[in-house]
């Protein structure tokens, strides 16, 4: 008995000594001492010991000296090296949002399993997390947006620390899968691509380049053109002017040495333009203030030489920074903002806007420009306040086909943000545009204020931004894209919801880098924007386009979903945890369906045919791979990678009699 007591005593002594040794050797490692810049987040930059806005971290009235300030959606990967014993933190929205309507949910994954999640936290609320990490090798800190979207989601991991016995943790870059090109190469035989319908106002200049692929040279023809329009058989450019009101069924034909392609193309001469979402390129996401005449010409050249124009991409849009910048000492952008007649001047980077416009038009492409209803643009260049009529006339004189009208400094003019004040500047410019003998697509950019999707068309908008600016992160792109649910009833031919430009390829707002979206995320991006019937505006430097990016942007079956003549925006038909299914009816009676996995890891996504309102066993086609997959029965189920998509087309099959 005494020997047993001695053994127990010895074991307890050994255990206590071991615990003492571990306690003595354990370190406290603050999360903020690690490289938190490896975090990926939806807005702003991550900060150590500061909020996302760079202020001292403060949650629910308590200020914290240590912590990690970020913005939902946010993800930070941490290699624990198997030596971490525990983690704890206070979490919540930073008080710097001053009671604004943000809300977030915090989550922690340990070795690919969800280990903890908070309730939805709003301004003034906080909670504490404490986790045992014994044996855990990898940890992921997540902050998710909730149903109210990403605005004001300034999230803090306050006093976040690890207890570690051994090597210290280190943050790591998020995993990134290899690029896989899914789009098949275009056939050498001729194929006509892009939109099947086009709207023009009576008497307005008409310009349309038939998008077609196939071995060059191609020969183009168009039978049934309305009076006043002609086609160049060598370039496929249809031009002229017509007042022949009505719908004109035109048969387009493209031939080469290998065959012939035909397609019906409807020209609608009436009071509505932008019958399909505009497709093209915008300068801001790659060049920002560095934009100039030569870069615009190079973009037009690249749209042709790359072959993207053969898939329907048509607009070359100049964003901010083309006008005079008041008070600047840079001679390239300083000078007289307007001439003696009040007409706006371009700066020296754009020496001849009419010549630039003519150059773009000579290729069968269209050109766009940018302004603001306030005195200054967002980058402090001259804008249209009190000169709306002058500027609309100047834009038409220059030959512009598209106007992005950005709220910017008008926030200092508006008395408040009631509906009348929000609509007023856009009505004013719309009236001015309507007096021009030129069709100018009118793009409202005011970040969704006042639920612009409910009234954008009433003030003359052809499209309207529904959110703030997009960035090339999963958190930004997915938050904006999936946040379009419920807005579908406000979109249609001539008036489109706009979730912002595409962030694939070389982007960077002046400092170019490859998109931070993973390959799977980029497929999700293009698939979702196509289902949403969104304007598609490329934001990358097209002179540096790689094969992966080109193939993302040149899949004709994906583009046809976006450009479908019905103009129906996809509807969210399923949203469960991190799985979503969206469906878009198409003109030919088929249904485009996107099955999305928003989760951190590969998972199965299923949807029943009943939920899709489909009877029978429809034919299934993989749209990206352009491959038939047989027939569906009862439901669709696919294993989809993290942040990935399966984009399919379901076509009813007629029963044989």
Language-model-derived ranges and their functions:
Residues 24-182:
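Gly-Asp-aromatic-enriched flexible segments
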Residues 190-215:
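Solvent-exposed, low-complexity, repeat-rich "mucin-like" stalks and linkers
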Residues 210, 246-258:
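A short beta-strand micro-motif common to beta-rich folds, especially ectodomain repeats
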Residues 228-244:
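Strand-loop-strand motifs at the edges of beta-sheets in extracellular beta-sandwich domains
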Residues 285, 299, 303-418:
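Aromatic-lined carbohydrate-binding/catalytic grooves of carbohydrate-active enzymes
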Residues 390, 438-541, 562:
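Glycan-recognition surfaces
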Residues 523, 529-532, 537-539, 575-614, ...:
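Carbohydrate-binding surface patches
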Residues 631-657:
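C-terminal beta-strand-rich structural cap/linker in extracellular carbohydrate-active enzymes
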């Amino acid at each position: 008995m005494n020997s047993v007591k001695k053994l127990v005593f010895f074991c307890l002594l050994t255990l206590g000594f071991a615990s003492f040794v571990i306690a003595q050797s354990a370190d406290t490692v603050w999360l903020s001492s690690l490289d938190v810049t490896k975090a990926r987040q939806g807005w702003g930059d991550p900060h150590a010991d500061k909020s996302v806005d760079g202020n001292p971290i403060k949650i629910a009235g308590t200020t914290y000296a240590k912590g990690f300030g970020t913005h939902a959606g946010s993800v930070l990967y941490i290699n624990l090296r198997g030596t971490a014993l525990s983690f704890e933190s206070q979490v919540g929205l930073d008080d710097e949002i001053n009671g604004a309507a943000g809300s977030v949910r915090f989550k922690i994954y340990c070795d690919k399993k969800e280990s903890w999640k908070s309730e939805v936290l709003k301004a003034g609320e906080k909670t504490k997390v404490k986790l045992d990490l014994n044996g855990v090798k990898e940890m992921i800190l997540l902050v998710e947006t909730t149903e109210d979207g990403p605005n004001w989601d300034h999230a803090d991991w306050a006093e976040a620390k690890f207890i570690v016995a051994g090597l210290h943790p280190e943050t790591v870059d998020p995993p990134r899968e290899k690029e896989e090109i899914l789009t098949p190469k275009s056939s050498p035989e001729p194929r006509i691509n892009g939109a099947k319908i086009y709207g023009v106002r009576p008497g307005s200049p008409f310009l349309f380049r038939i998008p077609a692929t196939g071995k060059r040279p191609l020969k183009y023809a168009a039978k049934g053109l309305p009076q006043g329009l002609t086609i160049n058989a060598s370039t496929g450019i249809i031009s002229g002017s017509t007042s022949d009101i009505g719908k004109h069924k035109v048969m387009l034909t493209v031939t080469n040495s290998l065959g012939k392609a035909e397609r019906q193309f409807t020209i609608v001469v009436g009071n509505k333009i932008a019958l399909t979402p505009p497709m093209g390129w915008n300068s801001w996401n790659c060049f920002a203030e560095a934009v100039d005449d030569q870069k615009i010409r190079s973009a037009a050249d690249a749209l042709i030489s790359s072959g993207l124009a053969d898939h329907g991409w048509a607009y070359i849009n100049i964003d901010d920074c083309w006008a005079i910048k008041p008070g600047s000492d840079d001679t390239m952008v300083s000078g007289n903002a307007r001439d003696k007649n009040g007409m706006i001047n371009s700066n020296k980077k754009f020496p001849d806007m009419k010549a630039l416009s003519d150059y773009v038009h000579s290729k069968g492409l269209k050109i766009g420009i940018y302004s603001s209803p306030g005195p200054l643009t967002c980058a402090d260049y001259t804008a249209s306040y009190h000169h709306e009529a002058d500027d609309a006339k100047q834009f038409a004189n220059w030959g512009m086909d598209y106007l992005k009208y950005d709220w910017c400094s008008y926030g200092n003019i508006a008395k408040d943000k009631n509906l009348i004040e929000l609509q007023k500047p856009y009505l004013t410019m719309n009236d001015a545009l309507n007096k021009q003998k030129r069709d100018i697509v009118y793009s409202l950019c005011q970040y969704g204020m006042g639920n612009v999707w409910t009234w954008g068309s009433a003030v003359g908008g052809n499209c309207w931004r529904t959110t703030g600016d997009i960035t090339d992160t999963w958190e930004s792109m997915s938050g904006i894209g999936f946040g379009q649910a419920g807005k579908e009833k406000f979109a249609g031919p001539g008036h489109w919801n706009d979730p912002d430009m595409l962030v694939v390829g070389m982007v960077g707002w002046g400092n170019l880098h490859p998109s931070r979206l993973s390959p799977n995320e980029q497929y999700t991006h293009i698939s979702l924007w196509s289902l949403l019937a969104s304007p598609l505006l490329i934001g990358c430097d097209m002179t540096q386009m790689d094969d992966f990016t080109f193939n993302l942007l040149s899949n004709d079956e994906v583009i046809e979903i976006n450009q479908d003549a019905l103009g129906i925006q996809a509807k969210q038909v399923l949203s469960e945890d991190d799985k979503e299914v969206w469906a878009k009816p198409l003109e030919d009676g088929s249904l485009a369906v996107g099955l999305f996995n928003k989760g951190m890891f590969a998972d199965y996504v299923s949807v029943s045919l009943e939920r899709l309102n489909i009877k029978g066993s429809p034919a299934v086609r993989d749209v990206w791979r352009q491959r038939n997959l047989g027939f569906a029965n009862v439901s669709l189920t696919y294993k989809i990678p993290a942040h990935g998509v399966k984009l399919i087309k379901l076509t009813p099959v007629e029963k044989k009699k």
